[in-house]
A protein has these predicted regions:
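Catalytic cysteine-centered active-site loop
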Residues: 1-52
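Short consensus segments that form the blades of beta-propeller domains
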Residues: 2-3, 61-63
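Aromatic- and glycine-rich peptidoglycan recognition patches
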Residues: 28-46, 62-115
Length: 115
């Protein structure tokens, strides 16, 4: 898929859900537009409870000026979540382990229906 103007991190999360067949309007409403909105529309979970499709954030809200979000796309053999996210510094989508970056894990509060 070619996106003429690119995506930010929260837009990439929405795009992932839509590519899996979720309704666009419902996804925007239930997942949220913008990193902080996606934080607000999700519930905190432990790293050990992360499932594919859960969200990973770098900063905690409130209390920080900025944030970054990615989506869990799988796991290493040791159970470490793999997070896909738009990297501004690399100017592309990358898949990273949580490492020291992604510290906060959340699950969207609403279940999406497929088209």
């Amino acid at each position: 898929t070619t996106i003429p103007y690119g995506l930010d991190c929260s837009g990439f999360v929405l795009w992932c859900y839509i590519q899996l067949g979720a309704d666009k309007t419902e996804t925007i409403e239930k997942i949220g537009v913008g990193t902080w909105n996606q934080w607000d529309k999700s519930a905190e979970i432990k790293k050990s409870d992360v499932r594919t499709g859960d969200l990973a954030f770098i900063n905690k809200y409130p209390g920080s000026d900025g944030n970054h979000v990615g989506i869990c796309v799988g796991f290493l053999k040791n159970g470490e979540p793999l997070i896909a996210h738009c990297s501004a510094t690399q100017n592309k989508v990358v898949v990273s382990t949580c490492g020291s970056e992604f510290k906060y894990f959340r699950r969207p509060c609403s279940v999406l229906t497929a088209n």
